[in-house]
Amino acid sequence: MPQMSPMMWFSLFIMFSMTMMLFNQLNFFSYKPNKIMSSNNKIKKKNINWMW
């Protein structure tokens, strides 16, 4: 059984690393979050006039 040279192992490692990074970037940039429509649910503030 022939052995792989160290340079071949390194190129294999680089190839798998680049594939993993590409896959992660594609997953990251393909995600589109849904916008939350909260225009109807506005926070009600109570106006308090402080009299010192």
Swiss-Prot record:
How this chain sits in the membrane, per its record, is:
Single-pass membrane protein
Q: What would be an example GO MF term here?
A: proton transmembrane transporter activity
UniProt main location, coarse? mitochondrion
Biological processes per GO annotation = proton motive force-driven ATP synthesis
Spans through the membrane: 7-23
Keywords tagged on the record: ATP synthesis, CF(0), Hydrogen ion transport, Ion transport, Membrane, Mitochondrion, Transmembrane, Transmembrane helix, Transport
Location comes to: Mitochondrion membrane
Sorted alphabetically, which InterPro entries does this protein's record hold?
Answer: ATP8_metazoa
The keyword RNA-binding is assigned to this record: no
A cellular component term from Gene Ontology for this protein is: proton-transporting ATP synthase complex
| UniProt family annotation | Belongs to the ATPase protein 8 family.
Q: What does this protein do?
A: Mitochondrial membrane ATP synthase (F(1)F(0) ATP synthase or Complex V) produces ATP from ADP in the presence of a proton gradient across the membrane which is generated by electron transport complexes of the respiratory chain. F-type ATPases consist of two structural domains, F(1) - containing the extramembraneous catalytic core and F(0) - containing the membrane proton channel, linked together by a central stalk and a peripheral stalk. During catalysis, ATP synthesis in the catalytic domain of F(1) is coupled via a rotary mechanism of the central stalk subunits to proton translocation.
Subunit structure, as described in the record: F-type ATPases have 2 components, CF(1) - the catalytic core - and CF(0) - the membrane proton channel.
Q: What is this protein called?
A: ATP synthase protein 8
